[in-house]
Swiss-Prot record:
Transmembrane segments: none annotated. In vitro, possesses glutathione S-transferase activity toward 1-chloro-2,4-dinitrobenzene (CDNB) and glutathione peroxidase activity toward cumene hydroperoxide and linoleic acid-13-hydroperoxide. May be involved in the conjugation of reduced glutathione to a wide number of exogenous and endogenous hydrophobic electrophiles and have a detoxification role against certain herbicides. Belongs to the GST superfamily. Phi family. Glutathione binds at residues 60-61, 89-90, 102-103, 115-116. It is an enzyme of class 2 (transferase). The modification Phosphothreonine is found at residue 177. Induction: By salicylic acid, ethylene, methyl jasmonate, auxin, H(2)O(2), metolachlor, and the pathogen Hyaloperonospora parasitica. One of its GO terms (molecular function) is peroxidase activity. PANTHER family: GLUTATHIONE S-TRANSFERASE F8, CHLOROPLASTIC (PTHR43900:SF44), GLUTATHIONE S-TRANSFERASE RHO (PTHR43900). Residues 139-263 form the GST C-terminal domain. It comes from Arabidopsis thaliana. Its EC number is 2.5.1.18. This is Glutathione S-transferase F8, chloroplastic.
Length: 263
């Protein structure tokens, strides 16, 4: 789970979806059904349940990462909102899915997983023949390069980007005051990371080569929130980074993730 969620245990559970489960066909965001979690067994029995279940909220950066992967892989799934404002993530039912009381958690048949990056890699490997090839199964060198940039995202980019998004975006949502000194420090750190990205993207269209991979996808949630802030200049001032962001943000799968936030 990302730094934003770690610091915001009540991270945005939209009231409009608090008591509902969404069934999605990843081919179209307009093709989904809503059933109340309180509905009777007779009414719910008419709904075909997806084998993949995601427990989370669409505004969560970590949940967004998993949802984007599901859409890229063209997989049907069921999104089960977790009412974090009511403390559902700390209740026994959710702790059985994620003992740390965080989101998201994923169920695929009899398999239960937590930690968003572990979930996305599982989906990319397990469903390698479906949808986009997010991890190369043919070339060990490409796969190794993808793994390098997956680590870079998790160890270098996200710790700074997520904390910066917390300062720039989420503090305001929760009536907290942005710390200008923290913003300055985090932007300084992120600039150095993005300088490395600029050099890398001068050599290849995407981080792991000429194809979109999980390494690119993992960046989308934090970037999405920062693009709406003054920190956008960090990306815009680097031509290759800016071009890369435009490409990955324009993917249909990502548009569906953003649409979910409006449901």
């Amino acid at each position: 789970m990302g730094a934003i969620q770690a610091r915001l245990p009540l991270f945005l559970s939209p009231p409009s979806i608090k008591h509902h489960t969404f069934l999605h066909s990843s081919s179209s965001n307009s093709n989904f059904k809503i059933r109340s979690n309180k509905s009777s067994s007779s009414s719910s029995s008419s709904i075909i349940m997806a084998s993949i279940k995601v427990h989370g909220v669409p505004m969560s950066t970590a949940t967004m990462r998993v949802l984007a992967t599901l859409y890229e892989k063209d997989l049907q799934f069921e999104l089960i909102p977790v009412d974090m404002r009511a403390g559902a993530h700390k209740q026994e039912a959710h702790l059985a899915l994620n003992p740390f009381g965080q989101i998201p958690a994923l169920e695929d048949g009899d398999l239960t997983l937590f930690e968003s990056r572990a979930i996305t890699q599982y989906l990319a490997e397990e469903y390698s023949e479906k949808g986009e090839k997010l991890i190369s199964q043919d070339c060990k060198k490409v796969k190794a390069t993808t793994n390098v940039w997956l680590q870079v995202e998790g160890q270098q980019f996200d710790p700074n980007a997520s904390k910066l998004a917390f300062e720039r975006v989420f503090k305001g949502m929760f009536g907290m005051t942005t710390d200008p000194a923290a913003v300055q420090e985090l932007e300084g750190k992120l600039q150095k990371v993005l300088d490395v990205y600029e050099a890398r993207l001068a050599k290849s269209e995407f981080l792991a080569g000429d194809s979109f991979t999980l390494a690119d996808l993992h960046h989308l949630p934090a970037i999405h929130y920062l693009l709406g802030t003054d920190s956008k200049v960090l990306f815009d001032s680097r031509p290759k980074v800016s071009e890369w962001i435009k490409k990955i943000s324009a993917r249909p799968a990502w548009a569906k993730v953003i649409d979910l936030q409006k449901q």
